[in-house]
Amino acid sequence: MSDSTIRTYSSDQRQTDNDETVSTPDEDVLTCPECGGQVIDDEEHGESVCVDCGLVVEENGIDRGPEWRAFNSTEKDEKSRVGAPTTNMMHDKGLSTNIGWQDKDAYGNSLSSNQRQKMQRLRKWNERFRTRNSKERNLKQALGEIERMASALGLPKEVRETASVIYRRALSEDLLPGRSIEGVATAALYASARQLSTPRSIDEVANVSRIDEMEFKRTYRYIVRELSLEVAPADPAQYVPRFASDLDLPDEVERRSRELISNAQADGVTSGKSPVGLAAAAIYASSLLTNHKVTQSEVSEVTDVSEVTIRNRYQELLEATEAAA
């Protein structure tokens, strides 16, 4: 008797649920306030329109879909801007997970000794799974080296990203055999800074690198040639803002320095000259011309250019300016 009652109730309940399920869509259908007809959404025009009388019930509707079109799944994945952010500065592009170094649980409580040992083992295995082969270990080491040098040189994120892409290209085209990881990473960072008009001198990059300057120059020429990188000659004017800022000089000095360099370029004086030396001499000359005097030794210390070079380029800049006048 009891079982029969239960079965009967369950059957009635299922029938009631089915009735509710069937009736739910009818409640969601919009009806026209004028004629009671069905209202449809015209997504192309952003309007809700009655199919019977043509009344526009709503207009300027919000299009909640993407503004781009994709014709296959590959295009959809490439154009989509949702999901976890990716970056070329990590060997796995930031798609894997990390186990935090803090030995605390979700509530901020310290872990016991056994739990700490367990987490240490998990971190070790997690790191091994993230770098499963020698190629990934190579990439991880190189990208870490790029990040270290870029941080020491004060280079922005865009330069680091581009340097990472250059290194990945060198790795994929098998350009590393016979060359050190540090050498290719240094060359990639220097080329990236040149491409994005945030140059650093060869001496500056060599000072933060773990390789000697000769290997750095040789590897840089090789990478640029093999990857067909478009690297324009360094413009001395690109160094001026940084040097002027380091010397705490006003905008007037920076503006005058650019004029001196422009005159020298028009006169052909800059050909074959170090851009850093020309920028240092322009800063020194413009500071004297605008009565914001700095000594040659101060400019030399900031720019890492010898005082002899500053004096020689200084004379050439003044001669070019006089010729332009």
From Swiss-Prot:
Organism, scientific name: Halobacterium salinarum (strain ATCC 700922 / JCM 11081 / NRC-1)
Role: Stabilizes TBP binding to an archaeal box-A promoter. Also responsible for recruiting RNA polymerase II to the pre-initiation complex (DNA-TBP-TFIIB).
Keyword Transcription regulation attached: yes
Zinc finger (TFIIB-type): 28-58
Family designation: Belongs to the TFIIB family.
Gene3D superfamilies membership: 1.10.472.170, Cyclin-like
Region (Disordered): 1-29, 73-93
Keywords of the record: Metal-binding, Repeat, Transcription, Transcription regulation, Zinc, Zinc-finger
HAMAP family: TF2B_arch
Sequence ranges of the Sequence repeats: 144-227, 238-319
GO molecular function, one term: DNA-binding transcription factor activity
Family matches, as Pfam families: TFIIB, Zn_Ribbon_TF
Binding site for Zn(2+): 32, 35, 50, 53
Protein name as catalogued: Transcription initiation factor IIB 2
Comp. bias (Polar residues): 1-13
Single GO BP term: DNA-templated transcription initiation
Gene Ontology CC: one annotated term: transcription preinitiation complex
